[in-house]
C-alpha cells in the first residue's frame, strides 16, 4: 500500500471583496490615486469612488445622463469620464473634495441631491459607437497646474476617423483619416513611440491597425502613415490595450480570438538601425525607397529568396522581414526604379500585416481587455460571466475567475510599480513597521497601495475585487 499522499486539488479563487452599489450594469472601472481608490461607472451615468482601505464609497454622483463608456485618472487630483450623452468631462477630485460629496449609492432608493465635483473641462464629442477615449499625457509633471494632455476619440461626423483634442485649450488639434472601408472605430489608444505620435485602432470589420506620424513633432498635426494592418478578427473588435514598452498591443473581439499585434518602430529608427548595421538606406523603410535593394539586385530573377538568418528563440526583426517581403514581391522589377511614398499611406513593403500570435480561446465575446502595468498578464471580461487572466508572453490562459452569474463588461488592474513620488512614503511606512508604530489605518493604506488588485464590473451592477499573482 502506497504511503504517498494524494495531491490536494487547487482551491478555486474567491474575490477579496464584493462592492455592491450600482443599480445598472457596470461599464467602466479604473484604479486611481496610487491604488487607494477604485472608480466605477454604470449604464445610468453614475460614478462611484470606492475607498479600498475600508471598501466603502467616498464619493457618488451622476456624471452623465446616459451610459458611461470610460473612466480614467489624470494625475492624482483629476478624473476623466466619458458618456454616451456626447460629453467628455474632466473633474477635479482631490481627497479633500470627497468630504463635500454624497456617499449614498445609486442602488439606495432614498432620493438625495448628489453634488458634483468641480468641473474643469468639458468636450462635446461623438458617441455614436461605444468607443471610449484615450488619454496621452504631455507634461512630465502629472501634478502641475499647467499640465497638458491629448484626448483621442472617434470623429464627430465620420465614425471611422479619429479626432485628437488638446487639454486644457479644449481645441481639436487634428483629425486622422485612415480609410473609409473599415467601419466604425470600436477601440483606440493614442501614445508616443520615440517621440512619434502613434495610434492603435480596432474597427467594426475586425481590422486592427497602427498609424504613426511621418515626422517627429510636439503636436499630432501632420501626415500619418499606416504601418501595420491586419484583419485577423472575424467580428468587431471590442477592446484593445497597449503594452507599457510600446512594442505590442492586444485585441479582443466578439469572436473567440485574442490577438497579439506588433507596433512597428518609427521609420527613422529603422533607418538608423540599418545604417549602424551597414545596410543601405534604400533597403530600409525610407520615404523614397528602391523597389529592390542593391544587395539583391545581382540575384537572378528566378533565384529563390533566402530568408535572413534568425537568432534561435528570437523573432525576425522588422527590418529583415521588410527586406524579405520586398525582395519576394519585386524580384521581377528593375532594381533602379524608384517609388515615391504617397502622402497618406506608406509603400506596400513597409506595411506589416502579420500578427505576432493568434489564440482561439473558444470563448466568444471577451471585452474590456487590460494589460497589467508590469506587462506579465492581461485580463478580459467575458459575456459568459467569467473573468479570464492570460500570460502576455505565451497568451496561455492562467486563471478563470468565477463569481458573477451574468456577463462581465469591464476589468481594471491596479498599478504594480509605485510612482517615484510614493517611494519616500513607502520608506517611511517600512521604518514605522520596524518600529512597531503602524496603526490599523496605515496597514490598510499600505495594503491597498501594494495589493495586486483586479476589479471586474458586471451586468448585475456588482464589482468583484480579486487579489492575484
Curated annotation (Swiss-Prot):
Stretches for region Disordered: 260-354
Pfam families: WD40
Superkingdom, taxonomy of origin: Eukaryota
UniProt keyword terms in alphabetical order: Chromatin regulator, Nucleus, Repeat, WD repeat
Location within or outside the cell: Nucleus
GO cellular component: nucleus
Principal subcellular localisation of the protein: nucleus
PROSITE patterns for the chain: WD_REPEATS_1, WD_REPEATS_2, WD_REPEATS_REGION
Family: Belongs to the WD repeat ASA1 family.
Functional description taken from the UniProt entry: Component of the ASTRA complex involved in chromatin remodeling.
Subunit record text: Component of the ASTRA chromatin remodeling machinery complex.
Name of the protein this chain belongs to: ASTRA-associated protein 1
Gene coding for it: asa1
